[in-house]
């Protein structure tokens, strides 16, 4: 099956990036948010990112206009998905929220429509069970910033069909992404490796081993990381990091995945990183 029209559920950081790459590659996109102000904000972010691409001569002005004209915004999930070939959900890492959304999507989307989640850690099989089409359900984990990062983790659930997998793999390549197949385990590959490293870096601060800037300097200068783990945590969002650590901890029942108490306190205090202007570092 060829994917000609997509619905993206959620216009936040990941959702607007996913919308951007589909629209820029000639695929019509229905983007839904909870209200029109948030939908307009997502569209504005996409336009700003396209403007940067025009300035850097990666695309021309006509391509920018064509991309924006390929996007239609909605505030009703049911209206968004009624005529699409693929739905990509990109809401926060909360199982109950995703389950509720996919129950609505499953009822409203055409029978042929593939349902994909951008979850970075939650079981694909578990979310798929909330629908009547687990064979058409799959994980499609993009990376931030979506227009730049080339990787997509493709995650089959217990009942995902080979046809569904092949369609999503082909679609990922059409988006100029590299699809990597991974099994349905908590955190998949990316976050199972990355998040414990970030969590351990937070423990270094929590236990007084080193200051945040020094922890990051060690990893950048000594391990050739382009960005330190604490700066990266701020960029991702400390709330997101905590959600993923909780999924790992609950999924594996292994104390090595226990979230650092400092991470929990910072999230409770609303210091979430870039998005709030303060995390391990301060931002304008």
Label for each model-derived stretch:
Residues 23-26, 66-86, 167, 172-176, ...:
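Amphipathic alpha-helical segments at domain termini/boundaries
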Residues 31-48, 52-65, 154-165, 179, ...:
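Rossmann-like dinucleotide-binding cores of NAD(P)H-dependent redox enzymes
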Residues 2, 27, 162-166, 173-184, ...:
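NAD(P)-dependent Rossmann-like dehydrogenase/reductase catalytic/cofactor-binding core
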Residues 58-114, 122:
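Rossmann-like NAD(P)-binding element
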Residues 25-27, 82, 145-154, 226-227, ...:
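Acidic/polar active-site rim loop that often engages polyanionic ligands
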């Amino acid at each position: 099956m060829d994917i000609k029209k997509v619905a993206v559920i959620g216009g936040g950081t990941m959702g607007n990036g996913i919308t951007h790459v589909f629209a820029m590659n000639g695929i019509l996109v229905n983007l839904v948010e909870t209200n029109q102000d948030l939908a307009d904000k997502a569209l504005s972010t996409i336009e700003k990112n396209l403007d940067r691409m025009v300035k850097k001569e990666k695309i021309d002005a006509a391509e920018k206009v064509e991309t924006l004209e390929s996007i239609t915004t909605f505030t009703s999930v049911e209206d968004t998905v009624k005529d699409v070939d693929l739905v990509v959900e990109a809401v926060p890492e909360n199982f109950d929220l995703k389950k509720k959304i996919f129950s609505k999507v499953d009822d409203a989307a055409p029978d042929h429509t593939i349902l994909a989640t951008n979850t970075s850690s939650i079981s694909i099989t578990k979310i798929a069970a909330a629908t009547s089409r687990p064979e058409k359900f799959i994980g499609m984990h993009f990376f931030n910033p979506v227009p730049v990062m080339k990787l997509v983790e493709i995650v089959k659930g217990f009942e995902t069909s080979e046809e569904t997998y092949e369609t999503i793999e082909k679609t990922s390549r059409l988006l100029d992404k590299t699809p990597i197949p991974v099994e349905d385990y908590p955190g998949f590959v990316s976050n199972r490796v990355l998040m414990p490293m970030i969590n351990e870096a937070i423990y270094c601060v929590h236990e007084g081993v080193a200051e945040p800037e020094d922890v990051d300097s060690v990893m950048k200068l000594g391990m050739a990381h382009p960005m330190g783990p604490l700066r990266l945590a701020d960029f991702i969002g400390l709330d997101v990091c905590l959600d993923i650590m909780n999924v790992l901890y609950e999924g594996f029942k292994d104390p090595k995945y226990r979230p650092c108490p400092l991470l929990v306190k910072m999230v409770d205090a609303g210091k979430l990183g870039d998005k709030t202007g303060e995390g391990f570092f301060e931002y304008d």
